[in-house]
């Protein structure tokens, strides 16, 4: 019986290896749980879902642009950048507050898709450097996995960077599109490129596409088109370069 506002009787049918029952309704609290028909050798385990645990989905509002600027800064500074909460050397883990060893492959998993959402949220609020830092953490895990195991993995360990789950899963591939967004480069066509902000990475980046070459430096960007024409853009102002 589950005692709350009403009583629900749990009937366990004996079988080899035990039995399991999940209540149909949800309850705000339990006054009593009783199971009848057990022998002295039987063991009963009662478990509930913990909705108070923080997980990476809490950053979805950043991606959707829901909070105002001050609230977003608060979320980024006090949660995303806090080592006691979500900040880890290889990315944002799924449920960092769960520290039990048996839950590690789930709680400490870095899901690249959810980290992508976080990065896009950072970009939305102007935190390009923070997005670049998080992306670099993710890529360190991806590169390490390729070097050690010659494979991508579905997820990566937030503390160690080791691969978790299925080998060569699509969800573990390096997000090239996200890299270009953080870099501030959008190739509209072989003759048209949109530039935004400055290169947040500590190295120059060269991109080649159908005869087009974009050399993204720290303070300037050179765009070389297939016909040989070259255009240099200084600073971090948004611009569309075309021929």
Regions found by a protein language model. Give the residues of each.
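C-terminal capping/lid segments that line or modulate ligand- or cofactor-binding pockets
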Residues: 50-78, 104-220
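Short, glycine-/Ser/Thr-/acidic-enriched flexible segments
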Residues: 40, 66-69, 228, 238
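Beta-sandwich interaction modules
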Residues: 3-42
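Active-site-adjacent bridging/hinge elements
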Residues: 35, 88-97, 149-153
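Extended ligand-binding clefts on enzyme/binding-domain cores
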Residues: 19-30, 46-93
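Active-site-adjacent structural elements in folded domains
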Residues: 44-48, 89-108, 160-163
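C-terminal beta-strand-rich structural cap/linker in extracellular carbohydrate-active enzymes
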Residues: 29-32, 226-243
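Feature 926 captures the class I aminoacyl-tRNA synthetase adenylation module centered on the KMSKS loop
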Residues: 222-224
